[in-house]
């Protein structure tokens, strides 16, 4: 496959434009607000409390959200090794990228039917949409070392995240215009735009713009002749085992992945629970009606701050990596994350203070994601087996996300508040920082 082909790179980065609407609109901005309101209010808008009975146990509504998200990620961890091994064996990872894209986008549309009275059933589209999003990224990320030379991978990765931030922000603004200007009132039955229409738009946007990517990405990266179809399903786990054995012989890569496992716990937990934290831990005033309107609009504004600052942040840290190197730049981002957690735990109680945190999160969010992806890509050996290597990366990422999200939810459930859970995130970032620091040395590492 030709590297640094402009048309190919443009098509690859455009998938970020297509699928980034899911983490923004569904997991960060509109759906968490929608879920929190629906599960704490009746049909007439009266507050009914945050406690929900599920399987005979009383849970805080935000903790159920965390646990369900972790369950969806667990399915991804179990499923993608099988499919990625098959994709590498067949040399047709584009087909799997399309499958997960369609699964995720159609599931987003299914969230239109979310209903508190059938909570378990309503969570199924959320689970399958999460599987679709993260599953597609395994195959999407594995194209990076094939389409871009090592010296261009930071720039290409950052361009993808920047496109994703811009595109998803554009759709969020469209949804906000619909919600604020044409909002449908379920009591008076007036208006045009139901909040749930946003979920339909996410699915249409994702599946529609992804067609540009699918049109230009090659169908096959290499050819294999299948001689033993019976071993295809176990091949994925064997491939992961082989990748692990190779990584054990590469101390730098092993140390980077260990560090990534821990600091990514904190990053992903923040992405998942940020809106719910702000809704429950920030002082929005004493009038419940005014507070509800204020918090919803303010949180959406904070998400937009994160998005647009994130565009600049991804390019800022890409530039910094060219000046001081990827590892030192990642260390800078981790230090900023630690400051964010300490500041949030001890200081953030008002909307203004939360806006400051939103700015800082936006600054480092895109940078840490883009640099993590490109740094891992640079550490990889020359091989055709990129999908299995990125599947291993994905498994490490998801295991960290599962543990981070569950630990956040468990501490919140046991202590009765989400603020105490921030302490666990600080620990994750510090461990990641300590493990990564030896990578700044130029001499060969032993780990």
Where do the model's predicted regions map?
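C-terminal ends and interior cores of transmembrane alpha-helices
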Residues: 98-117, 335-349
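Short amphipathic helix-loop junctions that connect adjacent transmembrane helices
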Residues: 26-61, 272-297
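Hydrophobic core of transmembrane alpha-helices in multi-pass small-molecule transporters
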Residues: 107, 118-136, 352-367
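Multi-pass alpha-helical transporter architecture, strongest
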Residues: 9, 113, 205-216, 368, ...
């Amino acid at each position: 496959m030709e590297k640094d082909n402009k048309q190919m790179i443009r098509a690859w980065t455009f998938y970020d434009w297509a699928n980034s609407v899911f983490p923004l609109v569904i997991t960060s901005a509109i759906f968490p607000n929608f879920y929190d309101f629906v599960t704490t209010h009746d049909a007439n808008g009266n507050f009914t409390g945050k406690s929900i009975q599920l399987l005979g146990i009383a849970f805080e509504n935000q903790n159920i959200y965390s646990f369900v998200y972790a369950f969806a990620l667990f399915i991804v961890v179990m499923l993608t090794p099988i499919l990625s091994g098959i994709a590498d064996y067949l040399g047709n990872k584009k087909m799997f990228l399309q499958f997960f894209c369609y699964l995720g986008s159609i599931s987003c549309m299914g969230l239109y039917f979310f209903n508190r009275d059938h909570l378990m059933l309503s969570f199924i589209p959320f689970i399958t949409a999460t599987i679709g999003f993260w599953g597609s990224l395994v195959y999407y990320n594995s194209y990076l070392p094939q389409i871009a030379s090592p010296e261009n991978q930071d720039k290409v990765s950052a361009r993808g995240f920047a496109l994703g931030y811009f595109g998803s922000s554009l759709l969020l603004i469209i949804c906000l215009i619909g919600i604020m200007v044409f909002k449908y009132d379920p009591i008076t039955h007036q208006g045009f735009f139901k909040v749930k229409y946003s979920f339909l738009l996410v699915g249409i946007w994702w599946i529609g713009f992804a067609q540009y990517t699918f049109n230009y990405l090659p169908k096959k990266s290499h050819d294999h002749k299948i001689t033993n179809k019976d071993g295809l399903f176990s091949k994925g786990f064997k491939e992961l085992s082989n990748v692990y054995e190779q990584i054990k012989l590469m101390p730098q890569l092993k140390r980077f992945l260990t560090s990534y496992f821990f600091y990514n716990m904190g990053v992903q937990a923040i992405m998942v629970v940020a809106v719910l934290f702000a809704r429950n831990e920030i002082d929005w005033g004493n009038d419940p009606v005014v507070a509800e309107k204020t918090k919803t609009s303010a949180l959406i504004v904070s998400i937009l701050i994160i998005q647009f600052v994130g565009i600049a942040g991804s390019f800022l840290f890409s530039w910094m990596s060219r000046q001081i190197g990827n590892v030192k730049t990642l260390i800078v981002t981790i230090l900023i994350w630690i400051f964010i957690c300490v500041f949030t735990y001890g200081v953030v109680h008002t909307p203004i203070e939360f806006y400051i945190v939103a700015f800082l999160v936006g600054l480092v969010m895109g940078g840490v994601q883009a640099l993590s992806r490109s740094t891992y890509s640079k550490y990889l050996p020359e091989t055709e087996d990129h999908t299995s290597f990125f599947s291993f990366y994905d498994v490490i990422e998801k295991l960290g996300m599962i543990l981070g999200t569950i630990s956040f939810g468990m501490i919140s459930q046991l202590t009765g508040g989400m603020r105490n859970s921030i302490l666990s995130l600080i620990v994750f970032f510090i461990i990641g920082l300590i493990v990564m620091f030896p990578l700044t040395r130029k001499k060969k590492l032993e780990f």
